[in-house]
Amino acid sequence: MKNITDQLWTRSEPTVIIPPLRRYSLLTNSVQTSFPDQSLSTDELKSRAIDIRKDIVTMIAQGGSGHPGGSLSAVEILSSLYFKVMNHDPQNPKWDLRDKFILSKAHACPVLYVHLAHCGYFPSAELATFRKIDSRLQGHAHIKTPGVEMSGGSLGQGLSFGLGSALSARLDKKESRVYVLLGDGECDEGQIWEAAMAATHYNVDNLVAIVDRNGIQNDTWTKDVMNLEQLADKWRAFGWNTVEIDGHDFTAILSSLEEAKKVKGKPSAIIASTFKGKGISFMENNPDFHGKAPNQEQLQQALSELDNLK
């Protein structure tokens, strides 16, 4: 007799009826199977980012709960990694030589799920099952979902996990790289700095930490909860190669990730300045949408605004 967990994760693919509100932007017959795709232009990445934002707000609205703000702030970061930087194979999620992406701020899982769907790890229709009781797409990323590398929940753990993965790759003489996305509020956690110290001690140069510096945590401003400044100097003091960039500028993101590959003997930290809720006027830089789903009227407005960006 299987327990309930086994039943959830070994079930057949769900039959999903997507409400007539809108269908997800991905066309399943155009899914890529080879990454990274160096042929993608910056304009094509920008166009994909708009579609990804539309899918994020739609799935959260349909799920009735979720974290839109921190998902929308990280779109360009994940699009750069999944489409242009990381070696990965949606047809073989456990490919031994893959690069790994660790979502430490796992409540922002909608941005990860949508990228995984756009890459072909699972059908895009499954996005409509977000937070449903029998879904693989829960409110925090789970390792049994195809393409997810770490089960998340408690903040502060992802950098330690990523460090272990990077060390393991080095011991096995693999050229795999590990990318960890951290929230800036998450940097309040002491475990982040323990991992940061250990990473330089072991000279782990195949590890990159990216801080989504959107300035908001939960329902208020990070500076009012715990002042992190000077954040970049903190990472430098721990011995990391550290750069500060515009986290919505594809050129800056891709350049910083490429430069990180050239750094030897130390890990790299990228402090990416972003706007929570980026791309949607009433969500942008608004703490209210840290963890609140848009209602139907708000969703229609959000989709209209995003369509106007095309």
Name every feature range the model reports, one short phrase each.
Residues A49-S65, D212-G215:
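N-terminal capping segment at the start of a domain
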Residues N3-D6:
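Intrinsic-disorder-associated, low-complexity terminal segments enriched in Asp/Asn/His/Tyr and depleted
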Residues M59, S71-E194, T200-H201:
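Cofactor-binding active-site loop characterized by glycine-rich and histidine/acidic residues
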Residues G147, S151-S154, L159-K262:
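Thiamine diphosphate
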Residues V16-I17, R22-L27:
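Short, positively charged and aromatic/hydrophobic N-terminal segments
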Residues F250-K310:
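Glycine/aspartate-rich loop-and-adjacent alpha/beta segment that forms the canonical ThDP
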